[in-house]
UniProtKB/Swiss-Prot annotation:
Keywords: ATP-binding, Cell inner membrane, Cell membrane, Cytochrome c-type biogenesis, Membrane, Nucleotide-binding, Translocase, Transport. SUPFAM superfamilies: P-loop containing nucleoside triphosphate hydrolases. This is Cytochrome c biogenesis ATP-binding export protein CcmA. Part of the ABC transporter complex CcmAB involved in the biogenesis of c-type cytochromes; once thought to export heme, this seems not to be the case, but its exact role is uncertain. Responsible for energy coupling to the transport system. NCBIfam families: ccmA (TIGR01189), PRK13538.1 (NF010061). The keyword Cytoplasm does not apply. The complex is composed of two ATP-binding proteins (CcmA) and two transmembrane proteins (CcmB). SMART domains: AAA. One of its GO terms (cellular component) is plasma membrane. The gene is ccmA.
Length: 207
């Protein structure tokens, strides 16, 4: 039994089948990229895996239990960062991290922002930051979270090359420690092919 399992998922949108019979099992330490053309359903699949949406058929299981039966405990193990940064624009970058990680002290939050490339921007209201900087505020959570499972939708959007490298290193560290990373990205990942598992939505099934 894997940590996270998708079993015979079917998803339809506007009378169009995005994917059907989609099954796969993920284990601790896996780093997975969901691939497919625009409109293939990558974001939709991520939302199914977070439990924010339900499939038209099939089910998603966490440690052998359907998500809807373990929703609360599952969400405690999950970090989800979608297309929108999901941050409070009236708060500063530092205040945002305190809001999401109340058990993190100031030093930890400052270090996370520095790791995300935001040293010197800690006390600036988020609504005064660029799109890329706002994205970095959300992604700074990767250096604070204790979640086992990270689901990230296009995390590298509006991030420069150095930022992408730093984030990639953090994801590698997380999987090496037994965590799971699932992401979509249009950017090539600068990691060994042996470290990445790809699940394609251009096919009806994934192993």
């Amino acid at each position: 039994m894997g940590m996270l399992e998708a079993r015979e998922l079917l998803c339809e949108r506007d009378e169009r089948t995005l994917f059907s019979g989609l099954s796969f099992t993920l284990n601790a330490g896996e780093w997975v990229q969901i691939t497919g053309s625009n409109g293939a359903g990558k974001t939709t699949l991520l939302r199914l895996l977070t439990g924010l949406s339900r499939p038209d058929a099939g089910e998603v299981l966490w440690q052998g239990q359907p998500l809807h039966q373990v929703r609360d405990s599952y969400h405690q193990t999950l970090l989800w960062i979608g297309h929108q940064p999901g941050i409070k624009t009236r708060l500063t970058a530092l205040e945002n991290l305190h809001f999401y990680h109340r058990d993190g002290d100031a030093a930890q939050c400052l270090e996370a922002l520095a790791q995300a490339g935001l040293a010197g921007f800690e006390d600036i209201p988020v609504n005064q930051l660029s799109a890329g900087q706002q994205r970095r505020v959300a992604l700074a959570r990767l250096w604070l979270t204790r979640a086992t499972l990270w689901i990230l939708d296009e995390p590298f959007t509006a991030i420069d090359v150095n930022g992408v490298d730093r984030l990639t290193q953090r994801m590698a560290q997380h999987t090496e420690q037994g965590g799971i990373v699932i992401l979509t990205t249009h950017q090539p990942l600068n990691v060994a092919e042996s470290k990445i598992r790809r699940i394609s939505l251009t096919q009806t099934r994934a192993a």
